């Protein structure tokens, strides 16, 4: 199996290794919650007729039976003042029958009653003012329990006392954690279990504290009604997927499927990624009211049972980003499912339909007995090394892979043909061009002969491998080219059962081996951070680079780049903020390879060590132009002046495979 460095990964700091955090465990949300919410379509203007009509539609359209059961009335349901006894009440003009009656209506439909409140003095969407729960948590929790509420979405507006309770403050004077903790404790004291949805907009890296308080946490700012919001949200999800698990789910925000905002392929991408990242699936479209009905194509996306199954899978492990090809306009996410299955999503970011190929080793596999293409509705059998399919502009190839073999494993009966003493293996994958791949040949029975001959199409040389003392294996180093078109021929007096190939470890070059130019400079980090070096080069820009002379052999080389990015899009999320930074790698003056790296920070951007700028991640990129001997390698941000980010990520080091 390929080492972890081949994929995008996050390097744990010596302090606070990411893992499942202590979590609120009241038996709820063992899988991500599913339902419907008023906000994405009706904004802060809900009413009783709207909620009842859409709730009935959940049942009539077959959505409730698939798991969409939490029905939440978002902002705009209450009034400016509390009752004389200090308790919350509803807007009687909008909800003439009242909230308890609304809850009963939902329960009679076998649905669940969700309400919305705020950890500040007013609800988001004020004015007109709607009173919030700050300083009234215990009383409001009792009220919710008396109304037989099943879930609470708890927002973050008008909450920072030190700055006069502004509508929004993305840099509050203190962490929002204590305010959410107060409501969590108040809910826990009631004789009714309620799902608690922490909606803090990603402030203060809530993945580290929200699981102890609630069942889900918002990973970032609101989703906006634009296709670009999908990319921004996924970039923010990258450092948070490892925190997902039963009872603690990263909330990517409500769905825009069926809102007539996105194309059908875009909706498929949106729904696929939210599902496999284990986000709560909350419909934000108008399903049915006096003026609107959801279109059938979008409805069928929301009802896709296999995709829902990936979201609700009992294993409860989020997919993660495995590789990204920025200039080519695609990337792959994957994760494990119960029953030994794997789910993978290949996203086409380009504005054109085309064919894309998934190399299975990029998701840790070499072979799949069955590959189900969910949106295409096709199934392929006995897929070796690579899978190719057509995909629409902004669409996703969503795959379920079954009966798989780990990467680097090549059984003869699957990958090879034999004649006499010669066995030829096809579809051999190389992540990089190198002469240092390790091959182990497994023989069917013990051999008294001392040698096995190996020929790779990457070289015209025959390599002789000595059989081990047991007589059942022979090992050697062999060359492979980057890609999936390599072949290997084994000549042995004994038949060959299988071969195992592991890629080279490569050589690591820390940032301290690089010289800086222009504005770029070297910065020391706190003990145990900026792993594995302890320092980094910052201020990489169009006129600030990191440069090194690196000895290597000729060919196409895979680089595993250690970087840091905690440039979180808060205010800019409403515009073109993407949570990414632009990085370029140039080898020997050739055209640079460009990659947009996602966030890496796993600590608070406000109060954490290094404000999250000491947390390293690794991303891989394939580079050309290498020659035998010394190579001039430049890490920069070419194009930063042309609409990309002005500064690149901080650079920790790189490994050349």
Swiss-Prot record:
Record Pfam families: Melibiase_2 (PF16499), Melibiase_C (PF17801)
Keyword annotations of the record: Carbohydrate metabolism, Disulfide bond, Glycoprotein, Glycosidase, Hydrolase, Polysaccharide degradation, Secreted, Signal
Recorded GO MF terms: alpha-galactosidase activity
Catalytic activity, as annotated: Hydrolysis of terminal, non-reducing alpha-D-galactose residues in alpha-D-galactosides, including galactose oligosaccharides, galactomannans and galactolipids
Domain of life: Eukaryota
Keyword Signal assigned: yes
Broad class of where this protein is predominantly found: secreted
Family to which the UniProt record says this protein belongs: Belongs to the glycosyl hydrolase 27 family.
Protein's UniProt name: Probable alpha-galactosidase D
